[in-house]
Amino acid sequence: GIIKLLSEMVEIKSISSDKNHRDDVDASAQFVQNLFAGLGLNTQVIKVAGGMPAVVAHTEIDPSKKTVLLYAHHDVQPVGDLSMWDTEPFNPVLKEGRLYGRGSGDNKAGVVVHYNVVKKLLEDLPVNIRIFVEGEEEIGSPTMSDFIEQNREALEADVIVIADSANVKIGVPTITTTLRGLVDGFIEVDQPMRPVHSGMGGGIVPDAFMVLSKIIASFHDDKGNLQ
């Protein structure tokens, strides 16, 4: 059943940030591939240069139907301080209807959700299905842009469903319609080519720190909204 399947996934120590667990991340990807291959989907494990293994899969594509991409990730965070755990992180335990173990929620549950939905609807799917289960989300998906660039066709879809969010509260099914994004970059501010005394610099002619602080302060309005 669902609990048994999720438990088997949780037992795999797919810690993407730990080089000592590279084999476990590979094993986790293989597990996910086998899952969807068992449903008859076309599946692949793909790893771009410097990246962790991701699984892509798809049903037979009917051009007359819309295509839905189901996203999740199979890697997990390190366990941290073991003294803070009441159970062994990779020995899943079912207590009062909840499964405890590293990745039981984030995000191996998401993989199992996608698997069971496809399994239930497979004989009469109203849409084309593509699957993307990455293996480096917990380290910031450093090769995501390269992966997308190299596998655009495998990820092409009209809608994306991400099984990696949270419920409003336990037991209440929840659909999240927006998620925070992430943008990084560099801001360079020129300053005098030689040191100046703090009592002499700044003021009418602002120094680099003043300019940079104003730029950063302009990112949000008084209510915290991005501008």
Q: Can you say where each PLM-predicted feature lies in the sequence?
A:
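Predominant activation on well-ordered alpha-helical scaffold segments within soluble catalytic domains
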Residues: 7, 33, 112-115, 119, ...
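Acidic-enriched catalytic cores of C-N bond-cleaving enzymes acting on peptides and small amides
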Residues: 198-227
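Flexible glycine/proline-rich, aromatic-decorated loop/lid segments
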Residues: 174-190
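Acidic/His- and Gly-rich active-site-bordering loop/insert found
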Residues: 1-102, 121-126
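Generic secondary-structure signature for well-ordered alpha-helical cores
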Residues: 11, 37, 123, 152-153, ...
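Short small-residue beta-strand/loop micro-motif enriched in glycine and branched aliphatics
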Residues: 100-101, 193-199
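Acidic/histidine-rich catalytic neighborhood of metal-dependent amide-processing enzymes
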Residues: 103-178
